Amino acid sequence: IKNHQSKQIVVFGVGDYTNSREDVHYVKCVSEDELLEKFLKFWETHKPDVITGWNSKFYDLPYLIHRIKYRFGEDAVKRLSVWKTVYKDSVYIQGKEHICYNVFGLEQLDYLDLYRKFTYSSQESYRLDHIAFVELGERKDPNPYDTFREWYTKDFQSFIDYNIQDVEIVDRLEDKMKLIDLILTMAYNAKCNYGDVFSQVRM
């Protein structure tokens, strides 16, 4: 998790991680249950209004919700919402169903969606690695193993570094492109919710 204003990063993990950065706070946990509980307490304390990520709408948030639900049950998922209301939804893209969630009181501005809608350019790939190279001239660290699970279990240090890099790339994209700033301004001028900016009809 990275705060765009303060630039501080908080990382939750189950394993030993050597942290040498002042802008990174590593929260070591002994189990997945402890990690999820500490994450939920962090979330409830800071109460984010807007979150972003690269394909976070269809991957990061659904994965997180599925793990919380599996470990703690449906009621624990409601802790992500200031209104204690979370709805499951589905969207069909090119004939394939994608699961997403509506967390009341939280606006999800997926940076992949923002980039596709507001850059008015067509890319050969919308993988974060490619967009980072096009826009920032940098590449993501490659996975040195066959699977992410293997990477996680065999080299936890570089695996965490990789995840931090993911967050920082999205943050640097926003520093350069100001797409979230654009959304906030458009929503303010149109007197609509942030997510409604994606729909011309609602605006």
Name each region found by the language model:
Residues 48-56, 186:
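Short glycine-rich phosphate-binding loop at a beta-alpha junction
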Residues 149-203:
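Common nucleic-acid-contacting/processivity interface regions adjacent to the catalytic cores
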Residues 21-26, 61, 70, 75-167:
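Active-site-proximal helix-loop-helix substrate-binding element of RNase H-like nuclease domains
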Residues 1-50:
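Conserved RNase H-like, two-metal-ion catalytic cores of nucleic-acid enzymes
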Residues 2-6, 45, 70-79, 180:
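Secondary-structure transition/capping motifs at alpha-helix termini
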Residues 38, 63, 131, 169-173:
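Amphipathic alpha-helical segments that form well-ordered structural scaffolds
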Residues 65-75, 187, 203:
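Short secondary-structure boundary/capping segments
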Residues 56, 61-67:
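A short acidic (Asp/Glu
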